[in-house]
Amino acid sequence: MTKWSFLTKHGRVLVCIAHDPGVRLRDIAASLGITERSAYTIVGDLATAGYVLKQRDGRRNRYVVQRHLPLPETALHERTIGEVLEVFLAAHARP
């Protein structure tokens, strides 16, 4: 059977960042089973698109998800990033 994911890698990285704004690229990669290079590229894509802002915090980066922005999908354009993230973050917080 073909392996697939409900969320794209970009969506999964966005959830990781929303859960922990100080998360390291190494930790994103390890938790999602991707390379650090892929994590770096995806975070760069999200930053270029304006969905994530990168801020230096000493030697590390902190990320700010722009939750007010609409989803890029046309079928869900009336929803914001924050509304969708709340669903995934609430599910993650449950024991």
Features from the language model and the residues they span:
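Short, cationic-aromatic polyanion-contact patches
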Residues: K3-H10, R24, R56-R79
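Alpha-helical residues within the helix-turn-helix
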Residues: A30, A47-T48
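Short, hydrophobic-biased segments on the C-terminal half of alpha helices
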Residues: V43-G44
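Amphipathic alpha-helical dimerization/coiled-coil segments
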Residues: P70-P95
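Pre-recognition alpha-helix immediately N-terminal to the DNA-recognition helix
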Residues: R12-V15
